[in-house]
A protein has these predicted regions:
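Non-catalytic signal-transmission and effector/linker regions of two-component phosphorelay proteins
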Residues: 1-8
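Two-component/phosphorelay signaling modules centered on CheY-like receiver
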Residues: 8, 16-36
Length: 55
């Protein structure tokens, strides 16, 4: 059986605790994959260009 493609997610929040909670929750989902995290929009922009997340 072919597995569906996982949705790649970049988690962006200024709080390290919130990033950790979101990363753990998203990672628990079979169809989602956290490809990175960022603490601000400037770092997020660089990571979006490099990692090409879906969300």
């Amino acid at each position: 059986m072919i597995r569906p493609r996982r949705i790649k997610v970049l988690v962006v929040d200024d709080s390290a605790i919130v990033r950790k909670i979101l990363t753990d929750a998203i990672s628990a989902e079979e169809d989602l994959e956290v490809v990175g995290t960022a603490p601000d929009p400037f770092i997020a922009r660089d990571k979006i260009l490099a990692l090409k997340p879906d969300v």
